[in-house]
């Protein structure tokens, strides 16, 4: 038997499809999401409706974004969910969540079992819409969740950690074994909750500058910041901000990255593109 087939659908490798089938895990995720009628619930990658059904049961209306044409068609003819669903057969990476929130008249509650092959770039896409999002609950590769929640001075701490924590409060919810999926992925999974900050703990004047600094620092994470960020900051400027030029990217806190971004935004602002 082909272990990539689930409920008559062949999992497509190019879409990174692994279908959740463990009822205990499904119940735990739905409980963590706690969907309520009247909320603007949006599911990314509903697949074979493992989460869509139990979430949809609690709602009058649910929006789903599904790239796979066959799966989107199955949802349209779903026996009891069909009338409740608004289906966008589209890539979530190009979806305008801000427009949807405006249309629905409230911030979105976004959830999904995300395809692991796009999870990190999709996170960055969603971060650009945090003003339009109330919260997010995602099943991700455990290693990605570890990176999202990591603090300074750890191997998992990187650009994703800094940017996620700049935008959101990040809370791990539960770990999920490969056996909970068809076909089983080769890695462990985990569920994470991301709640955009109501008030930014470390506001920056230009988030593009923060993105640039973190990219340059972590692209050369073994170098000291004296070297990796030498084109942006002199040793005198670093020490003036209370930063040791001998530190590496992974030693610098989110607050310190934001401090650096604000210095640069004031003293060497990026030109509008």
Curated annotation (Swiss-Prot):
Task: Give the reaction(s) catalysed.
Answer: adenosine(1518)/adenosine(1519) in 16S rRNA + 4 S-adenosyl-L-methionine = N(6)-dimethyladenosine(1518)/N(6)-dimethyladenosine(1519) in 16S rRNA + 4 S-adenosyl-L-homocysteine + 4 H(+)
Q: Which Pfam families match?
A: RrnaAD
Keywords in UniProt for this one? Answer: Cytoplasm, Methyltransferase, RNA-binding, rRNA processing, S-adenosyl-L-methionine, Transferase
Q: Which GO terms describe its molecular function?
A: 16S rRNA (adenine(1518)-N(6)/adenine(1519)-N(6))-dimethyltransferase activity; RNA binding
- Quote the record's binding site residues for S-adenosyl-L-methionine: 18, 20, 45, 66, 91, 113
EC number(s) reported in the record: 2.1.1.182
For this protein, the record's InterPro entries field holds: KsgA/Erm, rRNA_Ade_diMease-like_C, rRNA_Ade_Mease_Trfase_CS, rRNA_Ade_methylase_Trfase_N, rRNA_adenine_dimethylase, SAM-dependent_MTases_sf
Question: Where does this chain mainly localize?
Answer: cytoplasm
Give the enzyme class.
transferase
Compartments where found = Cytoplasm
Name the job this protein performs: Specifically dimethylates two adjacent adenosines (A1518 and A1519) in the loop of a conserved hairpin near the 3'-end of 16S rRNA in the 30S particle. May play a critical role in biogenesis of 30S subunits.
UniProt family annotation: Belongs to the class I-like SAM-binding methyltransferase superfamily. rRNA adenine N(6)-methyltransferase family. RsmA subfamily.
Q: What is this protein called?
A: Ribosomal RNA small subunit methyltransferase A
Native source organism of the sequence: Shigella boydii serotype 18 (strain CDC 3083-94 / BS512)
Source organism phylogeny? Bacteria, Pseudomonadati, Pseudomonadota, Gammaproteobacteria, Enterobacterales
